[in-house]
Amino acid sequence: MEYPGIKVDTVTSGIQRRVKGRIAKTNLNVSLASKIKAKILNNSSIFKISLKHNNRALARALSKEKENSRRITTEKMQLQKEVEKLNFENTFLRLKLNTLNKKLVEIESHVSNDLLTAIEISSLSEFHQGSFLLSATKKQRNSKQCKPAHLPYARVLLTSENDDDDGADDKWQTKCNNRTISKTSPDSTSSVSRQPSSLHQCNLKAFPPKEDNQKTCGSGHLEHTSSVDILPNESHSDQSPKSSLSEMKTAPSPSLRREKLSHGNVTMRKKCVSSTPDILYVTDLDHQPTSSPGSNWNNEIHGHTNETSNNTQRNAECFLDLPSESSSEPDAKRMELVQKNTDSFHFQKTVYDAADMELTATDIGKIVAVSKSKKNQNKKKADCRKETFRKVKGASSDKKRESSKRECKDGSEVGAEEEADAARAERGAGVLDGRGDSEEPNCISSTEQPSQVNTQKKRTLQNSSDQENIQNTKRRQTYTTDEQEETNPFSRHSVKFLQDGKFDLCQKTLHHNLSKPSRQTFVIRKSEKDNLFPNQEDKDTISENLEVTNEFHIDDLSIEANENVCDHETQTMLDLKKSVSAQQNQTKINKTKQKINRRTKIISVMSQVYEDNDKDIHVLEKDNFPFHTQANKETTSGNLESSKEFESPLLFTRDNGSLRDCKTQNVLDLHKQIPDLYPDRNESQISKIPRQKVNRKTEVISGVKCFSNDQGVHCSEKDKSLLLQKDKDFPGTLKDLSEFDTPAFCNKDSAKSCDYKSEMLLGLKKHDPNMQPACQDDSKAGKKLRQKVNRKTEIISKITQIHENDRGSTHDSLNKKLCQKVNISKIISQMNQIYETINEDGNGFKSSIKDCEDIKSCDFGEINSNKKENYDPIQDPCTLVKKTKRKGSCKAGSSLAGAKNRCGLQLTDSSQVQSVPLDSGLRHHPNEADSGPGEQTNLPKMQKQSAGRSLGDAFSVSLGKEGSRPAKAVSKMTPKSKKRKLPLGCSPETHGTVEITPNTDLAKAVDSQQTEKENYLEKEKIAKRKPDFCTKVLKPLSETCSSNIKNSSLDSMCKSSLPLSISSRKTLMLEESSSLESTCIFQVGDAAHEKITTGTRNPHHRTQKSTPGSRTSLVLVDTSSVSDTNPANPENESEGQSSHPMRRKRQCVPLNLTEPSLRSKMRR
């Protein structure tokens, strides 16, 4: 048997070894696999991180490379554009050089070949010189001048602006050459006549020799020119001047025109002594002469001055050297071409009509010859350069041109020759180009002029040179614009300039045609502009007037009447100056008057505002008026707002209970504070608004006083309700309020008592004038109290009267006597917040209010006047009052159970009674416990307690008489459903309201008691409501207590139990029997114990304190027996005993206590 067992063990051991080995291997493999996996993961994470970094680096590098490539491409594009521009400029420069070389070659050939032709043309001018003398006074024209072009020899401007002009210039040149060739007559077919014309065309582009220019500018001689008339061919085309005119109109700006001079215009090289280069002068075929600013030449027929250059002289010499058969045709064409070239120099082009530019077979062209004159006239020439005159075309000039053409046709050549011979006789013959004699006999220049023409030349030359000065000044003044100077006709500066003689218009005015208006432009500097034009409107008006009068003057006088014209213009300008200054002065005076009137009106309005406006003072926006009135208004309004709190008299009490009305004093102080704010002001102006508001507030105060007088006790009690606002700082201290005691309501009219009270309050105010007003918080709290009191005063007073009447009607003569002896005062319940828990039937609020009113008005006591002497005054008494009533369970709203009774407490010689409100959770139920004949059962009702903040607040309770039999007072707890109906005067959120009843007057006489009885009997007849209301009359203290009240025992006290249930955070309302010797002070907190301080004269009061439960309750049980010590009132005692058992069963209500501690205490 052992063998198999051994065998099994060996097998199992082997199996176990194998299994263990396999397990170890698998574990090793798993561990290795996990390690490998971990390594792989680590490596992969490392790889991922490295790849991310590499990717980022590559992306950055790629972005950089892209940016570099973009930059390179942009630079490449810019370089390509620059290369293209440079290539274009190179090609342009090559073209310029080529054209320049061609022009130089042409100029050289022209200078060498065309000199003799110009001399021949100048010799032919003698025969056609006198044809223009017939229409001397009818063909006057204004000289047209142009600014010189300062172009050096062979200068080429290589700017991009002129690139497009070169081709146009070349085309224009070829057109002019073709036109010149085409205009030759068919009769002259020789190429010799065409070659000089082309050479002359090239000569126009050339420059004169240096030596001639030096002689012309340096010699100081003035060359006067005479015209040579050349008849053009009949086959001359009419379209050629029109085309040339269109080319002139479409010519570019003056800067571009200077560029064209190098291509197709006559140029002069500025060199040596010459200040300005001379420019070619050529007259139009319509007899319209043009003058260069360099020199002045006078046409003796027209009366104009013009200056010609040496280049014109040489052209004339070249024209004279031409063959006779072909000289007439190309010369006219050359003159035409020269006119086109010279017109391009003018910045202000002259506009011609197409009819004026047409050439006919009878039109005569002029070529100018040069002669020498005096040296002193060259100085005037230098002053009159660089000037351009604008030629204005008039309607009459066209007619004169036509008449001059007709006269030129009929003009005789003989008269011209005779005048030329006379001129030669008077003046010596001059040699062209400053040389001695001409090589050709026909080259004698026609310098013979008549003496009459010579004198007219001098006169017109002087006038024209002076006029150029005037035009130069005017042009400079006109173009000096914008910020520094302003142009306006007939300014003060211009008149002064005329008077100083800087230029004399009598001798220097330019001659105008009869139809041309004169126009002057003057400069006004900034220093004068402010004086002349104070206002922009005046400036516009004056400028309009001057523009209207600017065209008033038209020169309808001849040349000899220029002085009169000048005088007339000067006088007109002076008159205009006076009128302008008068208008300026008038406008200034008017504006000043308007401003003064406005300011005066504003001042008067301000005075009216200060005098009449009682509410707002609007200060106008002037610098001379102060801006303090608004601040005064705001300060005054602030003071008045602070004084709004005193609209109704606020009465406050101190330790002595004295009162003070703060309203009047604060209002009077307000008048003193307001003048102190701004002593420099008139007090009457500042205090107007406060006075008005103070008057309104005084009316309000008087209205309130009247209301208090009319409404009777309500307002007086309203004032009295605030007496305790300051007493809350003194808990436990009872004040003597005897001075506030009001007499009994012995009169039918209750207003008398209110008047008495008002007088008493005023006396108190006088009694303590130094008292400080209460803080603002107290006044605000008083306001809230007063607001709520006003709403509830009438209801409370009415219900009080009803209850008094009901009580008087239901009771017998005993109760009537009680009413006679009691000082009745109405109680004002002041509630800050009504407890919001309303009963399910919805009528709890009304019923609670009415119940509260019933309790407040129906608790009375009786004081036996015969027993006053038996009691000593008690120091600091605190009467604990318990007011109870029972709400009928079957009635809702204001209906009350018929079993409700009034609890009467008898007080002897007590000055104050304090009522402390109970919490909403406090419930009283009558305990139907077995009581002996010595026990008294107090049948209370549900009550609404009013809050009293301090135990020092004084309350008086009317006392009722009762028989010698003591009554048993049992505290009664109400059910929870009725608890909600109690509108308590003190909620957890608020501090509670104060209830005040004036104490009884202990010294009332019997007569006053009988008058009271009559009053109450009348009230009972008027208002009767519930007959079941009755007061429970307790046994008076005078019957139970003996004369040795200080050593009182159980027999000297009224045997009654005073159980009170007290909740947290609430003050207590305690009821004590007729004994006033005990003073109880209760302070109730959430977790604090109540302290009960009982007087030393109540040793038999027993305090019971219930610890279980969250709420602490105090039960005061007075176990003292009642001893009948007053046999003088047996009737009262018997009536009290008989009335009390009758209502005991109706007042018994089963206990409904939620807390067992309170139930057990109440059963005790």
From Swiss-Prot:
Species this chain originates from: Mus musculus
GO CC annotations on file: chromosome, centromeric region; condensed chromosome, centromeric region; kinetochore; mitotic cohesin complex; nucleus
Highest taxon of source: Eukaryota
Organs and tissues of expression: Ubiquitously expressed in proliferating cells. Highly expressed in the testis and oocytes.
Post-translational modification Phosphoserine, affected residues: 1042
Biased segments, Polar residues type: 238-247, 288-299, 443-472, 934-948, 1126-1140
PANTHER family, A to Z: SHUGOSHIN (PTHR21577), SHUGOSHIN 1-RELATED (PTHR21577:SF3)
Family to which the UniProt record says this protein belongs: Belongs to the shugoshin family.
The protein, known as: Shugoshin 2A
Gene Ontology BP annotations: cell division; chromosome segregation; female meiotic nuclear division; maintenance of meiotic sister chromatid cohesion, centromeric; male meiotic nuclear division; meiotic sister chromatid cohesion involved in meiosis I; meiotic sister chromatid cohesion, centromeric; positive regulation of maintenance of meiotic sister chromatid cohesion, centromeric
Main location: nucleus
